[in-house]
Curated annotation (Swiss-Prot):
Domain notes: A shared internal Thr-Glu-Thr-Pro repeat defines a family of D.discoideum spore germination specific proteins.
Top-level taxon of the source organism: Eukaryota
10 X 4 AA tandem repeats of T-[EP]-T-[EP], as annotated region: 339-378
GO cellular component labels: extracellular matrix
Biased composition (Low complexity): 329-426
InterPro entries: CBM2/CBM3_carb-bd_dom_sf (IPR008965), CBM_49 (IPR019028), Cupredoxin (IPR008972), Dd_Spore_Germination_Stalk (IPR052879)
GO BP term, example: spore germination
Annotated keywords: Repeat, Sporulation
Region spans: 3 X 4 AA tandem repeats of T-[EP]-T-[PD]: 397-408
Protein name as it appears in the record: Spore germination protein 270-11
Organism expressing this protein natively: Dictyostelium discoideum (Social amoeba)
Short name of one Pfam family: CBM49
Length: 532
C-alpha cells in the first residue's frame, strides 16, 4: 500500500494549478478512442491499469513520455497540461488502437506541466521534458514550502528549500498543488501559481517528512476528495469506465457504460456524490440514484459503506460516443464505533429465550404428534365415516388436521416452488405455504420507447428484483429476447443470471438491471427460476 500512498501524494504535490479543468483518459489497450474539448490550462491525465506498457506522444511533437504501466491498485499516470490551441492527437507507440484527440480553445500561453508515470513495481519514471523541477505544498499553518533543483530519482530532495509565512513561493520555477479535501474543519484547501517556465515534476521531489494537508484532484473525472494522515490516504475513490455497446438514433449516438467505483483509501466510504461534467449527456442510469444533477448511493437497498479495496458497479447510457467525466465527493468515517454494539445484544438474548421455551413446548407437542400420526396414516385416504368400529378417542385424533399441516407441506419444499415459478411480472408467485422464506418480486417499467425506421418499435426497460422473503436469494435466472442488456451476466442463448459482483440479493435488498427489446409493449420475463 505504500506505493499507492506515494502515488496519490504525488498527485497532490505536482498537479498543475493553472488548469481550469482536469480530465482522465483511460489509456488501456481496450479503451475506445476519445475526443475531448478543453481549453488552455486544462490538465489531461493518461491513466493505465491493464498491466501493459504504454507511452504518450502528441501529433505536434511537444509531448513524448517514457514508458509506463500499472494495475488497478497501482495505476500508471502521465499528466499533461494543455498550452496552445488547436487539435492535438495523442497516440501510443505500443498500441496503434490507442488515441485521444483534444480540441483546445484559445487562452493565454502557460507552462506545459507533465508528471511522471508509475510502473507496476511502484517505481517512478521521469517524463521526457527535462528542466528545473519545483513543487510547493500548502501546510496546515498556511505557509508554503518550495523545493527547487534538478530532478533526481532516489526519492531524496534536490536543490535548496525555503519556507515563508503566508507569502508566495520562492525559486526559479514553482508549481503549487491545487486540490480539495474533506478536512476535519470542513475547509477546502486551494492555491494558485504564477510560473512562466516549463516545469517537469517527478516522484523524486516528495518529502516524506512534510506531508501535505490535502491530497487529491477534486475536479478530475477519476478521483474524489481526500485527506492525508502521515503518509497515508484516508478517503479516496477511483473510477474506471468501460463501453459495452452503442447505437445511433435520430442522429444521436447512445453508448452504454459500466462504471467501477473502487475504494483505494484506508477508510470506508459511507456516501459519495458523483457530479457529471455535462448533465445533458446522461440519458439513463442504474444502480445509483440520479436526480438530474448528481448521482448518489441508493437508499432503497444496502449499497454502502464501500470498504477499502471494495468496488461497486453502476451503469449509464450517454448521449455521446465518449464517456462522461465525473467529479467525486466521497464521505468517509472511521468504523471503530460498531464494536460495543454486538457484544451486549447476543449475550443476554440467547440465554433466557432458549432455556425456557424449548423445555416446555417441545416436550409435550412432539410426544403426542408422532403417536397419533402413525395410527391414522391409512385413515386420511378414506373418510372418517368408514371408521365406525373405532372408539371416539380414535376418531377425534385423526380429525384435527394437524397432521396435514406439517407433513404434506414440507414434502413440496419451498425451493421446488420457487424454482418452477414461471410467473415473472410483479409479484412473482411465492412458493406454496412457506412463501415468506423465499420470495422474489420483479418490478418492470418502461423508461423510453421509440420507432426505428418508422417500422420497428423499441422500448427501454428498467427491471428490479426485490427480495421480499426471509432468506437471501442465492441465484436468479431468466430468459429474455433483449437486444441489449446490462447489469446481469449471460449464461447461454438469451439466458441470464445475477452478475458475479452481486450474486446474492440480501433480505429486503434488490438488484436493478436494464435492457432494450424490440417490442411495442412491456411483457413478463420468461423462464424465471430463483433459489434461496
Amino acid at each position: 500500500m505504500k506505493n499507492i500512498y506515494s502515488l496519490f501524494l504525488l498527485f497532490a504535490l505536482i498537479s498543475a494549478t493553472f488548469a481550469n479543468n482536469a480530465f482522465i483518459v483511460h489509456w488501456n489497450s481496450d479503451s475506445i478512442s476519445k475526443k475531448l474539448t478543453g481549453q488552455i490550462g486544462d490538465t489531461i491525465s493518461f491513466y493505465t491499469s491493464d498491466g501493459n506498457s504504454h507511452d504518450v506522444k502528441s501529433s505536434d511533437g511537444s509531448v513524448s513520455s517514457s514508458v509506463f504501466s500499472g494495475s488497478l491498485t497501482n495505476p500508471g499516470i502521465f499528466k499533461v497540461t494543455l498550452t496552445k490551441e488547436g487539435n492535438i492527437e495523442f497516440t501510443s507507440s505500443y498500441d496503434e488502437g490507442l488515441s485521444a484527440t483534444i480540441v483546445v480553445s484559445s487562452g493565454g500561453q502557460i507552462p506545459i506541466t507533465t508528471t511522471s508515470s508509475t510502473t507496476t513495481d511502484g517505481s517512478s519514471t521521469p517524463s521526457t521534458p527535462t528542466s528545473t523541477t519545483s513543487a510547493s505544498t500548502t501546510t496546515s499553518g498556511g505557509s508554503a514550502t518550495t523545493t527547487t533543483g534538478e530532478p533526481i530519482t532516489d526519492g531524496s530532495n534536490g536543490g535548496a528549500s525555503s519556507t515563508t509565512g503566508n507569502s508566495g513561493t520562492t525559486g526559479s520555477a514553482t508549481t503549487t498543488t491545487s486540490s480539495s479535501s474533506d478536512n476535519s474543519d470542513g475547509s477546502v484547501g486551494t492555491s494558485t501559481t504564477t510560473s512562466p517556465a516549463i516545469t517537469t515534476s517527478s516522484g523524486s521531489i516528495i518529502d516524506p517528512t512534510s506531508p501535505p494537508t490535502t491530497d487529491s484532484s477534486s475536479n478530475s473525472g477519476g478521483y474524489g476528495s481526500s485527506s492525508s494522515i502521515e503518509n497515508g490516504v484516508e478517503c479516496l475513490l477511483t473510477i474506471t469506465q468501460d463501453a459495452f455497446d452503442s447505437w445511433t438514433y435520430d442522429n444521436i449516438i447512445y453508448t452504454v457504460y459500466q462504471v467501477n467505483l473502487t475504494n483505494i483509501g484506508t477508510l470506508s466510504v459511507e456516501s459519495v456524490i458523483l457530479t457529471p461534467n455535462d448533465n445533458s449527456l446522461i440519458y439513463h442510469t442504474w444502480e445509483l440514484v440520479y436526480d438530474g444533477t448528481s448521482l448518489t448511493l441508493p437508499t432503497y437497498r444496502k449499497a454502502g459503506p464501500i470498504n477499502p479495496e471494495e468496488t461497486i458497479i453502476f451503469g449509464y447510457i450517454s448521449r455521446n460516443s465518449t464517456d462522461v467525466t465525473f467529479a467525486l465527493s466521497p464521505t468517509c468515517s472511521d468504523s471503530s464505533s460498531p464494536t460495543p454494539t454486538p457484544t451486549e445484544t447476543p449475550t443476554e438474548t440467547p440465554t433466557e429465550t432458549p432455556t425456557e421455551t424449548p423445555t416446555e413446548t417441545p416436550t409435550e407437542t412432539p410426544t403426542e404428534t408422532p403417536t397419533e400420526t402413525e395410527t391414522p396414516t391409512p385413515t386420511p385416504s378414506s373418510s372418517s365415516s368408514d371408521v365406525d368400529s373405532g372408539s371416539s378417542s380414535e376418531i377425534e385424533t385423526p380429525t384435527p388436521t394437524e397432521t396435514d399441516t406439517p407433513t404434506p407441506t414440507p414434502s413440496s419444499s419451498s425451493s421446488e416452488g420457487s424454482g418452477s415459478s414461471s410467473e415473472t411480472q410483479p409479484p412473482i408467485t411465492p412458493p406454496p405455504t412457506t412463501g415468506t422464506s423465499c420470495l422474489a418480486q420483479v418490478q418492470q417499467k418502461v423508461i423510453n420507447s421509440w420507432i426505428n425506421g418508422e417500422v420497428d418499435h423499441y422500448i427501454q426497460v428498467e427491471a428490479t428484483i426485490v427480495n421480499q422473503g426471509s432468506t437471501p436469494i442465492s441465484s436468479f435466472n431468466f430468459y429474455s429476447d433483449a437486444e441489449q442488456i446490462w447489469s446481469v451476466e449471460k449464461t447461454g442463448t438469451n439466458t441470464y443470471k445475477l452478475p458475479s459482483w452481486f450474486s446474492t440479493i440480501p433480505v429486503g435488498g434488490s438488484h436493478t438491471f436494464g435492457y432494450i427489446v424490440k417490442s411495442a409493449e412491456l411483457s413478463d420475463l420468461e423462464g424465471v427460476q430463483y433459489t434461496c
